[in-house]
Amino acid sequence: MSTTLIVVGVIVLVAAVVVLVLDARHRSARSRARREWAGRHSARYAVADPVLTGQWRHGPFSRGGAGTALELVSGEPDGNTLYLFDLEQGGAVVSTVLALRRPTTSDTTVELRLGSEAATTDGDGAAASEAGMDLLGPVGSRYAFTNDLESARRAVDQRLVLTVEVTGEDVSVLWAEGSWALAALDITAGPQRWDEVTAILARFAELMRLLPPVRHP
């Protein structure tokens, strides 16, 4: 019996070591890809930033909190600040986030969620209400949620529908918040996809100029 337990213990230990080695290799490859992408875009790379994500409240941040930005790339393509990072919440990486600063700031937030993301409510829209968001309606293959129905309707037109349709199902949510356009992307996406979603974000940010800007006294 004791011999069997020893064998089982050894097997478990070996399996744990293998998992750790594979995870380390994955992280190393991920870090290398992120550094190379930063280099190609004349951007900066940082291993982590625990402060950056505190400015956002919607998208994946509405469920798991601010979390931490890992494997962060920051730059200014076309003069606008861009961030690319892996979002860690509760000790696990839940998505890759791209954030592009918009030329204007608005108090109106617009989220475009996949049907599966919209269905995470309890059927009565509880999850949307908790974040102060109301269902605006379908926009192409996604569902739009907002904190200001009247203002958000200004930004919904055929151009937005076309942008939604080319976004891809690996983007769980596309949203405008404050002075940012953001996308939550599947963590398995690579450099080519990061480029594609960056271009989609630029288009989305331009369309969100229709949201009413914050007016300072």
Kindly give the residue locations of the regions a language model identified.
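Charged, low-complexity intrinsically disordered regions
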Residues: R35, T53, P60-G65, A69-P217
